[in-house]
């Protein structure tokens, strides 16, 4: 029989926002009607009341912490947070304990995902054993076990020779290398950006060059290896310039940016609050402006949250001792919609694309589009209601956000994965 989502608004193939009815059947989108009346039995209809219907959002950079970090997050709680944020596909980073660095561990992780995940989870495999940068993992075995791509996110692969070999192996398997870009000899042991905030409080700063020089090295290695190379959480104007030049040279490089690096700079940190501590750190206003420009001109391909939950006790240690990272799955769309679409910096279509079809295209995913035959991974979003961000209402175990109290519009109200309603606002 199927179910109709009635009276929504969505973008057609020409990018026009139109009144829409969508039929879900057998886990896929069976029909789409634009600007037409709907004749269907009442029991087979969900009236979404004029709200926005978009492809389920895609986040290719999240930390679900399981195994080993279950006090911070689990696959179940993290994917419930994803569903609450309108995300139907997330890619899980491998900095867990143990890391998915061998076939058996990847198989365990896949089984755990099947048992507990609320949304689609794409597991990354580690580039090196234990993410220690000393010995490459067995790429072929990990791909066979279901690895999505390879990364040592959380640390940069310091050896150029090891990264080059990793890229050659990944290219032979038609897999991507996804990189946290940071030259450890240049990080200075810092906790924040090497800028005015660091100087004001006498803190050691992380210079911009430690990221940009790593990207510059890697894009040349990727060119030589013929590998798809993806830059995680780009944060500096120099990095944007390197990626832009690499793309112009025809190198197969893609890049992501986080909501927090688009929204904040180090000038916005209110004292020594560890909820503003992440890696890469909040950079200068010039850097933030370059990130926005890079996203708009296509240098940066899409947005990813780098959702990184920690316990309250960990974040209470202070800005120097606390771990890096903030949560982002439940706040990404409302923050970006309110502060960029409502202000005219981005169009609604651009924002939706950067969170759906753009990451899907970069990594060859079937998700990210509303089309007949596509997976029925769908989010319904209320663009009108204003609500303040309240960490105590988060589904994530992590409450570590710098955005508490920010008033936003653009809140997801329903999320479907494979045609199944996995989260609805107001329902337990």
Swiss-Prot record:
Record GO terms (molecular function): allantoinase activity; dihydroorotase activity; zinc ion binding
GO BP of this protein: 'de novo' UMP biosynthetic process; purine nucleobase catabolic process
Cofactor: Zn(2+)
Binding site for substrate: 63-65, 95, 279, 310, 324-325
Sorted UniProt keywords: Hydrolase, Metal-binding, Pyrimidine biosynthesis, Zinc
Enzymatic class: hydrolase
Record note on cofactor: Binds 2 Zn(2+) ions per subunit.
CDD domains for the chain: DHOase_IIa (cd01317)
Domain of life: Bacteria
EC number(s) reported in the record: 3.5.2.3
Coiled coil: none
A cellular-component GO term for this protein: cytoplasm
PROSITE patterns, A to Z: DIHYDROOROTASE_1, DIHYDROOROTASE_2
Catalytic activity from the UniProt record: (S)-dihydroorotate + H2O = N-carbamoyl-L-aspartate + H(+)
Binding-site list for Zn(2+) 2: 153, 180, 233
Pathway(s) the chain acts in: Pyrimidine metabolism; UMP biosynthesis via de novo pathway; (S)-dihydroorotate from bicarbonate: step 3/3
Binding-site list for Zn(2+) 1: 61, 63, 153, 306
Active site per UniProt: 306
Annotated family: Belongs to the metallo-dependent hydrolases superfamily. DHOase family. Class I DHOase subfamily.
Purpose: Catalyzes the reversible cyclization of carbamoyl aspartate to dihydroorotate.
Name of the protein this chain belongs to: Dihydroorotase
Organism of this sequence: Geobacillus kaustophilus (strain HTA426)
């Amino acid at each position: 029989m199927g179910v109709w989502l009635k009276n929504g608004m969505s973008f057609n193939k020409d990018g026009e926002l139109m009144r829409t009815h969508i039929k879900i059947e057998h886990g896929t989108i069976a029909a789409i009607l634009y600007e037409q009346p709907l004749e269907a039995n009442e029991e087979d209809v969900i009236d979404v009341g004029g709200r926005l219907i978009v492809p389920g959002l895609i986040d290719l950079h999240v930390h679900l912490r399981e195994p080993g970090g279950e006090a911070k997050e689990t696959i179940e709680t993290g994917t419930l947070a994803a569903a609450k944020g309108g995300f139907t596909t997330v890619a899980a980073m491998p900095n867990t304990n143990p890391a998915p660095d061998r076939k058996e561990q990847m198989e365990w992780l896949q089984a755990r995902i099947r048992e507990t995940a609320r949304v689609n989870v794409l597991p990354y495999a580690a580039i090196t054993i234990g993410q220690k940068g000393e010995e490459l993992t067995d790429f072929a075995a990990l791909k066979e076990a279901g690895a999505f791509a390879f990364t040592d996110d959380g640390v940069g692969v310091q050896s150029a020779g090891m990264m080059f070999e990793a890229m050659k192996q990944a290219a032979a398997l038609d897999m991507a290398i996804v990189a946290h870009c940071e030259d450890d000899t240049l990080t200075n042991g810092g906790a924040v950006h090497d800028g005015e905030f660091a100087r004001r409080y006498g803190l050691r700063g992380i210079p911009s060059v430690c990221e940009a020089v790593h990207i510059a090295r890697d894009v040349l290695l990727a060119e030589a290896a013929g590998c798809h190379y993806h830059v995680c959480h780009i944060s500096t104007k120099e990095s944007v310039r390197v990626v832009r030049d690499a793309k112009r040279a025809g190198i197969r490089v893609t890049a992501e940016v986080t909501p927090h690096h688009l929204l904040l700079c180090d000038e916005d940190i209110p004292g020594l609050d560890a909820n503003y501590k992440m890696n890469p750190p909040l950079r200068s206003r010039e850097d933030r402006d370059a990130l926005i420009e890079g996203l708009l001109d296509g240098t940066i391909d899409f947005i990813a949250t780098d959702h990184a939950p920690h316990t309250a006790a960990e974040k209470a240690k202070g800005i120097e001792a606390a771990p890096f990272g903030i949560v982002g799955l439940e706040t990404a769309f409302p923050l970006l919609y309110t502060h960029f679409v409502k202000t005219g910096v981005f169009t609604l279509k651009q924002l939706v694309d950067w969170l759906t079809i753009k990451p899907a295209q970069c990594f060859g995913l079937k998700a990210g589009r509303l089309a007949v035959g596509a997976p029925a991974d769908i989010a319904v979003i209320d663009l009108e209601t204003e609500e303040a961000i309240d960490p105590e209402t988060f589904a994530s175990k992590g409450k570590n956000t710098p955005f508490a109290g920010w008033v936003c519009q653009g809140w997801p109200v329903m999320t479907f994965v494979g045609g199944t309603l996995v989260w609805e606002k107001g329902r337990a």
